[in-house]
Amino acid sequence: MAGVLSLQFTPKSGDKQFNLQKVNEIISEYSDKKLDLVVIPEFFSTGICDDAFINSPEDVNGGEVVKFLSETARKYNTNIVCGTASERDGEKLFNTAFVLNRSGELIGKYRKIHLYNFFGGNEGTY
């Protein structure tokens, strides 16, 4: 039987450190369940906030959030799929999902191509 943990919480908009700590607390709470996969929601690190999306993107080779996810995957011996975080590649910003294995290796990522532009969302602007 596979152990899967799907996180749901309200991130503090623009407070990356608080949000990463919250993710760690939730995973820690369930770590005795032998988790095979942890799924983290979209914009978990910054909340849905245009300023945070623009001003604190991940480096294309992995920044603070990817390093945190890598350490967390190793610490809890689990695979992680994070919804999305902003990622910078040159001058472009992307809404990117990251996949890490139990060893903390970044084994995949997906950049959204159909971005949210209705009901006030502005992802397509970037």
What is the meaning of each model-derived region?
Residues M1-S6:
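Extreme N-terminal starter segment of soluble prokaryotic enzymes
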Residues Q8-S28:
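N-terminal phosphate-binding loop and adjacent alpha-helix
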Residues Q8-T10, P41, R111:
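Residue-level recognition of beta-strand->loop/alpha-helix junctions
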Residues S56-K67, T125-Y126:
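A short acidic, glycine-rich active-site loop
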Residues R88-Y126:
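Active-site catalytic loop in hydrolytic enzyme cores
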